């Protein structure tokens, strides 16, 4: 009882110093946690990727679409279990500040390929039968207060116009790594609109998602798919889903390196603050420590007291 009481009394010998030291350490730890969370969030999509899925896109750039007819040829490649496709939509909900990902998908094949998107059978069926239907992640629905049956208006950017979707389902993630901030709707709805306004852009998609029979065949299947469309008007680049996600991370690699560097600097700051506090405490109490040693207290006890008070 004597030692804790002694430590407590000496802690408040300099109340302001103790308060500022504690506050500095709390801020530093909170900053480190926030910075590491940002870095982890950047890699979340890649970490949640499946080894059994490939992504096929234009070899020139992701902004160039691929003909939908490629789907049938990809299905015929040995080792391919199924094929789906998706388009980035890029709509605006009310204002530019309300950003969230939106994808036009082939619902039957896409949902079958992503079992980690957990949705009830009733909501899945309602989504499949409603051409203007959409599903969103739980976090996104909670953020905007949406519930099943609501109407979601989006202002198109890549695909101009006002788009209205009926919320038919809210999906959860099979685990915490699954993104729950995305909206999915019918690719056919988007394609029909494009064919009316820009006929030459119809029946094209941004990416194909390829499900493998055996993940070990990823490299072989990727090479075969790209060889199939070599020397065509729209050559392809096929890579694992994780590699595809990491390609987006690579675009902002300099920012990530800077954030990681700052997070480690924060650790150094924490250690410097603690070392400075310990040094100040020890210097101020040399006489007291000498007296305690003269009274018979050992060096280990005095050292422990310094650490506890710091």
Predicted regions and their residues:
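Start (N-cap) of specific transmembrane helices in multi-pass transporter permeases
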Residues: 6, 10, 24, 280-288, ...
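Hydrophobic secondary-structure segments that place a key small or acidic residue at a functional site
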Residues: 86-87, 95-106, 117-193
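Hydrophobic, regular-secondary-structure patches
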Residues: 26-102, 108, 119-130, 142, ...
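N-terminal Sec/SRP start-transfer signal
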Residues: 1-31
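Peri-transmembrane interface segments
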Residues: 38, 42, 217-271, 281-284, ...
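Small-residue transmembrane helix packing/gating motifs
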Residues: 55, 82, 91, 166-220
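Alpha-helical transmembrane segments of integral membrane proteins
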Residues: 20-31, 256-276, 310
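Short coil/turn motifs that cap or connect alpha-helices
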Residues: 14, 147, 298-299, 309
